[in-house]
From Swiss-Prot:
Family: Belongs to the major facilitator superfamily. Sugar transporter (TC 2.A.1.1) family.
UniProt name for this protein: Hexose transporter HXT15
GO cellular component: cell periphery; plasma membrane
Signal peptide annotation: none
UniProt-annotated location(s): Membrane
One MF annotation (Gene Ontology) recorded for this entry: mannose transmembrane transporter activity
Feature: compositional bias, Polar residues: 1-19
Amino acid sequence: MASEQSSPEINADNLNSSAADVHVQPPGEKEWSDGFYDKEVINGNTPDAPKRGFLGYLIIYLLCYPVSFGGFLPGWDSGITAGFINMDNFKMNFGSYKHSTGEYYLSNVRMGLLVAMFSVGCSIGGVAFARLADTLGRRLAIVIVVLVYMVGAIIQISSNHKWYQYFVGKIIYGLGAGGCSVLCPMLLSEIAPTDLRGGLVSLYQLNMTFGIFLGYCSVYGTRKYSNTAQWRIPVGLCFLWALIIIVGMLLVPESPRYLIECERHEEACVSIAKINKVSPEDPWVLKQADEINAGVLAQRELGEASWKELFSVKTKVLQRLITGILVQTFLQLTGENYFFFYGTTIFKSVGLTDGFETSIVLGTVNFFSTIIAVMVVDKIGRRKCLLFGAASMMACMVIFASIGVKCLYPHGQDGPSSKGAGNAMIVFTCFYIFCFATTWAPVAYIVVAESFPSKVKSKAMSISTAFNWLWQFLIGFFTPFITGSIHFYYGYVFVGCLVAMFLYVFFFLPETIGLSLEEIQLLYEEGIKPWKSASWVPPSRRGASSRETEAKKKSWKEVLKFPKSFN
């Protein structure tokens, strides 16, 4: 095999290829329509997956990290926006003047729009840019949407006393972040090894929580400025995050599924080999490429992918689309953005003079809790995570809302708040965020990223994710009005939603732990009952241990095992 190192220059040819001018000589003379992999080539033995030591795991996570960093963009916006709405200079530039108090303020409408315009852009961007993944490749599409994100940041920074210009910039900024919310989990799910797919897709959510945390820290650091640096510095830092993603795309392998769909089979082998740190001629690599190719050919026999295909009952795509839409909708109806968007305001209302500091505490809990999710999601399974998350968040939200309604203002809304009740609400908010960050926050993206056949994946993921941003817009815009009217009774609305989430997951969402993307297709086609799906074994593995057993066998000692050269 010969390979030439490609130029680091960012262009379509570079980003659409995992390794330029690479030639792979497959065993035998078979065409790809029949498959490269042949059991006779390896003496009738099915090739084993490559064994990984610490270095192998490290390489996989480092290669996937630049893709997952796309989650940092919406997280950063959530973190800085929560601080902006309480900054004096920001309110002076984009708010209204109240003569009775001599202060600037943001009306409920303007505050709601400030929070929600980003979500509007994201919902449009996710649908509008998803098609680029099929025409230009996943990596180049990500670079394009990140450039759009940078344009939106420029418009925001240049705004001066023109709230409508700032909002336009916020929408364009959201277009790019929305594109990332579809394209990044898509690419992660397609390059990740099956046994690590859940954890690697969870990195997207981990970076979102990292963005929220650093966003809180940023506005905490600039809040004492008296000029526009108070909010322009956090917005300006967006360019640094965007450049990290763009440069990172030079290192990430292209999706082997996209390459095979484009008849670039040899490059697909190189992509699989790169992420697994083996030779492109390894029999296991050829077998993986052959399985992907078989899935692509099977999808082609069903005809060209169209928007109409999303409503197909025969291939169970409609069922999966409904699941994707509802899972992304439920992700917002957990009530998490009630805390993340308005956390600073909420904790001022419970008697804390510096809500910025409390937001940093919440951001820290959110970030480190998501690290736990990355570590365990491929051992516990999707259903168990979601069911536990819905039940535990329900309990936390009931307590939070009840304390707010019954105990926070013992002498009425016009009287002083109870410090003890306020502290208890903060504690249960932290419990709630822990439960959310370890379950629904990462797993919702995993479910959507791995549920759809490659032929309709970009369309189905874009629609599912658009509902996430749509509900984020609705919650972000209407929360100031609702809390102003019913105060902490608002928490009971989310409790009802959490009950519905638990029931839906139990009766309608199948378990996909340990399955390849092609095997998930078979799971849906066989119509397995969701509550029995954890014990389902794909045809190629029948007679072996169940998927849950195999996942549990992999101890953390094995995952963190150092190669001999390290000992």
